[in-house]
Amino acid sequence: MKNPCNVIAIIGKPRDQQAIQTHRELYEWLTSEGYQVFIDDRLAAILDEIPQSQFASLVELGKNADLAIVVGGDGNMLGAARILSRFDVAVIGVNRGNLGFLTDLNPDDFKEALKAVLKGKYIEEERFLLEAEIHRHGQIKSHNAALNEAVLHPGQVAHMIEFEVYIDDSFAFSLRADGLIVSTPTGSTAYSLSGGGPILSPSLNAISLVPMFPHTLSSRPLVVDGKRRIKLIVSPENRGTQEVSCDGQVSLPVSPGDEIHIYQSPNVLKLIHPKDYSYYHVLRNKLGWSSKLF
């Protein structure tokens, strides 16, 4: 994070009154502390008591802010991350969602933790994203980024699809399955975990491939080096349309015969945590693991 931190962005979608109140409290407290504060312009109509000059788009916030505070759950963080990762801005989260693997701060007691962060007492880590491209007849038809995962799956009707998997242009395996989850370490505690994938430490430079309901007894999740390029070739015999879903928020249409290229993005999310942050404490707390015996 840039030091000193002068410009702070508050980001989040209109969700419920408690979340809106947290945006309001953050703005009032940070401005009283002397910081220049701007807010996600999606909140302009709701926070109408705040001057319109203090609202800006996510791109503008990413360009100008030293620190971005995302209010909400992991979904809000994922949506913000795909844009903020393009810029040199640190990001921290206030949890107003459910599990909150990426949003550390308690909404009812954020001031002390934020004071320490703003004084330079924090842990910073970089989380890599994936880029997903749909290739058709040698041309890129669509693309997007994902912090958690890129998922190949059928369109609106659930059915089995066939595809081949290549790693660095070397054939790895073919599958008849409901799809494939290609996950980052950040996403290994999300959809990938539900599909039986491994939990990867966030600092690992690795990508996991998790088949979804494969029609075989031998298929298992596979972990590959994070610098490998994944190519999926969709069978031209598949019926209907398929999709690639990025973080469960953006869908890229896929036609039979298309190629899907998935690789590590050059952009990273600069995620910061309070000094007392422990990834394994988060896992134990969120996943309900047993406590120490002695």
UniProtKB/Swiss-Prot annotation:
SUPFAM superfamilies: NAD kinase/diacylglycerol kinase-like. Keywords: ATP-binding, Cytoplasm, Kinase, NAD, NADP, Nucleotide-binding, Transferase. Involved in the regulation of the intracellular balance of NAD and NADP, and is a key enzyme in the biosynthesis of NADP. Catalyzes specifically the phosphorylation on 2'-hydroxyl of the adenosine moiety of NAD to yield NADP. GO terms for cellular component: cytoplasm. Belongs to the NAD kinase family. It is found in: Cytoplasm. One of its GO terms (molecular function) is NAD binding. PANTHER family: NAD KINASE. Its cofactor is a divalent metal cation. GO terms for biological process: NAD metabolic process; NADP biosynthetic process. It catalyses: NAD(+) + ATP = ADP + NADP(+) + H(+). The active site is at D74. Pfam families: NAD_kinase (PF01513), NAD_kinase_C (PF20143). This is NAD kinase. It is an enzyme of class 2 (transferase). It comes from Vibrio campbellii (strain ATCC BAA-1116). InterPro entries: ATP-NAD_kinase_N (IPR017438), ATP-NAD_kinase_PpnK-typ_C (IPR017437), NAD/diacylglycerol_kinase_sf (IPR016064), NADK (IPR002504). HAMAP family: NAD_kinase. Its EC number is 2.7.1.23. NAD(+) binds at D74, G75, N148, E149, H159, R176, D178, T189, A190, Y191, S192, L193, S194, Q249. Disulfide bonds: none annotated.
